[in-house]
Regions:
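The feature captures the conserved acid-bearing segment of alpha/beta-hydrolase catalytic domains
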Residues: 292-363
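N-terminal cap/lid segment of alpha/beta-hydrolase-fold proteins
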Residues: 59-124
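Catalytic active-site module of serine/aspartate enzymes centered on a nucleophile-bearing elbow/loop
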Residues: 374-398
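Active-site glycine-rich loops that stabilize anionic/oxyanionic intermediates
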Residues: 133-145, 296
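Conserved acidic catalytic loop of the alpha/beta-hydrolase fold
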Residues: 246-267
Length: 398
């Protein structure tokens, strides 16, 4: 079948009843919703609870008959978390002209929220994972690979980890922003966008896939071929407004609250690149562990971020790929990644000395070579997923 694997969405009628009864709290209403309404209330009223599908009376038997390699989803759906509602545009709304009124008088907009797609597996182990993408990316990066294999969300779903895949505010399916006009164009597009929009070649070099596209570094795990590179570049997702780390962290805090209300469990927070920098600012109350994949930086010892993580006792592991210590010295990005890696090592040393729990994994030291900044999309992404799963198990999160 497509992408070489089967996704079976199975839920017997009895399971539907039991899960609905056991999940009385769902992600709460975002600002502007009627008081007391919840996401579950809204979906239940419309008969759309989690876009669920059922296989009446066949769940247990089918589960026994199907290979363990098949991904079986009990429930899936989408919701938004956080965000604000803009003040009404000056003037009175006229329903007779509605969208033809270019003044937008009386209109409001729901903006700057995060959007979440979730999947809960039949073998849910009670340790949900919240995934946050990096710069120029969306949740798609966790869900597949450039050559069409299973992404990390599928690999961890098979291990029993529910997936909550985030598009951060002003990105992807969370594109509505206060800096956007009602017709979908940025008020500040001309002056803001061109200054920080790398092209394909710049991404390729900075992400350590190869020196210049389409060549790959020797021993690279990045998928081979023109089609894989084409698919990778087409994952790139622009911002619809200015990046705001404080705003993003608040929205992710709301996501964590919603996941806790929905599952009754704290979440493992898996971040990547720019998302890693945001991740350190997210409120910690509903986070059980952090897995940071080449984060854009790490907290300074003694900082507010650092103390918050330390006091919460959150275990942290930080992963780095190849071509850092051995990267081309004439490429400025090599120095950047060396500094980021060294900063992470210093963070871990301080965090552990102060009673915390942090490991920094440099994959070549583990005998895992050839990985770029996108290790979760490369040909050995399953090997790295297993490595992380072993760490989670060592923390009792399995």
């Amino acid at each position: 079948m497509k992408r070489g694997h089967i996704i079976a969405i199975l839920l017997a009628g009895v399971l539907t009843v039991s899960m609905l009864a056991g999940c009385s709290s769902q992600p709460g209403a975002t600002q502007g919703d009627a008081a007391g309404d919840t996401l579950q209330d809204t979906l239940a009223d419309t008969g759309q609870e989690g876009n669920m599908a059922t296989a009446e009376g066949e769940g247990a038997a089918a589960s026994d008959a199907i290979s363990s390699d098949v991904l079986m989803i009990a429930r899936q759906g989408m919701f938004s978390s956080g965000g604000t509602v803009t003040e009404p545009v000056e003037g009175e709304y006229d329903p007779t002209t509605n969208w033809m009124d270019i003044t937008r008088a009386g209109n409001t907009a729901h903006v700057d929220h995060a959007n979440v797609f979730y999947q809960i597996p039949v073998n849910d182990n009670g340790n949900p994972i919240v995934y946050l993408h990096g710069y120029g990316q969306s949740r798609m990066g966790w869900m597949t690979t450039p050559d069409g294999r299973e992404g990390w969300s599928d690999l961890f779903l098979k291990k029993g980890y529910a997936a909550f895949l985030v598009d951060q505010p002003r990105r992807g399916e969370a594109g509505a922003t206060a800096s956007m006009t009602m017709d979908g164009f940025l008020d500040t597009w001309a002056e803001d966008s061109k200054d920080y929009k790398p092209g394909d070649q710049a991404w390729y070099t900075h992400f350590r896939i190869g020196r210049v596209a389409p060549e790959r570094y020797e021993g690279s795990q990045f998928p081979e071929g023109d089609e894989a590179q084409d698919q990778f570049f087409r994952q790139m997702t622009p911002n619809t407004g200015n990046f705001d780390q404080t705003l993003d962290a608040a929205a992710l805090g709301a996501v964590m609250e919603d996941v806790y209300e929905m599952t009754g469990n704290k979440a493992i927070f898996v971040t990547h690149s720019q998302g890693g920098a945001v991740g350190w600012d997210v409120p910690v109350e509903n986070i059980s562990a952090i897995v940071a994949i080449e984060p854009g930086g790490t907290p300074q010892p003694g900082s507010e971020q650092y103390q918050r993580l330390l006091e919460a006792g959150i275990p942290i592991t930080i992963y780095f790929g190849d071509y850092i210590d051995n990267g081309p010295e004439d490429i400025m990005s090599t120095g950047f990644w060396q500094a980021v890696h060294n900063g992470a090592v210093q963070f871990a040393e301080s965090y552990n000395a102060d009673g915390g729990d942090c490991t920094v994994v440099y994959l070549p030291d583990e005998g895992i070579t050839g990985n770029s900044h996108f290790m979760f999309q490369e040909m050995n992404n399953d090997v790295i997923a297993d490595h992380i799963a072993a760490w989670l198990e060592s923390k009792g999160l399995n």
